[in-house]
Every structure is written in C-alpha cells, then in structure tokens.
Amino acid sequence: MSNEEELILDYYAQAYRLEMFSYRMMGKLLETDNVHNRLKKNNITELYIYGGGYLGVQLYNVVKPYVDVKAIVDKSGNLSVNVKGIPVISLDKLRTVYKNEKIIITPIKYYKMIKKELVEFINEDNILYLGEFLEGVI
C-alpha cells in the first residue's frame, strides 16, 4: 500500500469513527431519563448549547423541559437545519451576554478548536463536551 493510499484509508477511518460517535450520541439523546439525570449530576439549571447542527438541535429539544436554555450558539449565528422557534446567537454575541452558565459543545470534529475559543472568556469548568455530558467521557 502506498503512502497516499494509507493516508486516504486513515482519513476514512477517522471519518467513520466520528460518524459512529455522532450516531451513538443521537441515541443517547433519546434516553431522556439519562439526560435529565446528567443535568442534575452536573448541576445544570441554565445552559448554552454550542453547535447549530443536528446534535445541537436535538440536545436543545431534549433539555428544554428541564433547564433554561439561553440559546444555541453557532459561529455563523444560524442553525444548520431548518427549525423555527429556537433562539440562536453568534459566538460574538455570546461574548457579550455570557454570565457564568454551563455550555455544552456538540460538534464532535471541532470540539478542541471550539473549546480553545471559549476558554478565552469562559471558565473551563463551565464547558462540557457532549460525550462528557452524556457519558462522563471526553
């Protein structure tokens, strides 16, 4: 196998792992009792959700009955899916309105990059990764 073929195979293996983890997280979000228990365990009463894609919108729908979801945060200030009635703000807006609430990061592929931006103005203890929130793992 050539180096180029190995790189392509590695790329597809990584993409497959990300897709499988996303699929597992979507399944975990269907376990509403678990989600409610995880909210209690993490003492979450107010929350921002980072990521306007499927995982962010699904998390919003599941936690909304239990906590005050301030908004979904997306760098662009828009949802990636067409859903009405969900408050969405940009990262720049979050910088001006944030008041020590928890934030759960839903984009799996870009978690580290997003966290790096958030720790500039948010205490690291208030930032959770979706996998960490749902399963206690990063």
Report the location of each language-model feature.
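Hydrophobic, well-ordered beta-alpha structural blocks that scaffold small-molecule cofactor pockets
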Residues: 2-138
